[in-house]
Each structure stands twice: as C-alpha cells, then as structure tokens.
Amino acid sequence: MRIFSLLILLVVASALQSQVVVNENVKHSKYAFPLVASKIKATVCYDANDYPVVKKVAELFVSDIENVTGQKLKLADEWKKGRTVVIVGTIEKNQAIRQLASNGKIDISPLEGAWERYLIQTVNHPFPGVDKALIVAGSDRRGASYGLFSLSEMAGVSP
C-alpha cells in the first residue's frame, strides 16, 4: 500500500483571514500541520459534552481522510496527549477550545454571538504532551461542522 503524506498548511494572512493549502509533500513550516505522514497520524478529538453532530462530523472527517490517504486517524472524545491532534468543537461546549481561548492561544471573539462561523488555526504546544494542534472551532454546531467539512473538501473529498 502506498503511503501518502497529507499536509494542511495554514498561512495566516491577517488576524481575521487565513489561507489553507493541502499538499502531499510534508514541508516544515511554523503553520504546517501533518494529518498523515510517514510516522505521524493525528488524533481527531471532540468533547463528549458537545453537540452530537460534532461527534458525527469528526467520524466523517476520519473516514474522509482514510478515503484520501488509506490511513485511518484515531478518534477520541477528549483531547489526548500526542504528537499532533485535531480539536473540533463549539466555543460553547468544547472544554479544550475554551481553555485555549482563556489562555490566549486562540482568539474566539469573532465567533462569539455569530451563526455558522468557524475558525481554523494551528497552535504549537497547546497542552502538555501535545506538540501541535489543529483547532477547528465553531460558533455553533453548524460552524464546527462546516469548518471540518471544509478541510475534507480541501483534501479532495466532494461534499
């Protein structure tokens, strides 16, 4: 089986805008986030207390990445220690996202009070034992879903 490398490269254009690039060649960058690489498989984490649709979309994302790369990501109902993690959830109910915001590692203020909006951002060393996290924070359950689906779409999955 041929192993593909899938890389999501986040380049922050400004405080409110970002550009996401999906690439099969892993390049080292401050904003690069390897989902699947030769020795790396990210864990997709959601909060068990978040809306049920967040769990469902996390499961679909894991399936989408497996369809594209042939590699299955791990899925967890809380953030886990590991080299790379994807944390998906709503700003209201995801404890990890709220903690990152309160520690000043992500700015969720543009999402507060908004409908169907999301933020995608990489964070280096967000928690002890985690090297890098890709945060997909939604203003509400639809926002979290749209954010993760947009990553699937960028990886080549048709909605």
Language-model features: where?
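Contiguous, structured surface segment used for ligand recognition
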Residues: S18-P159
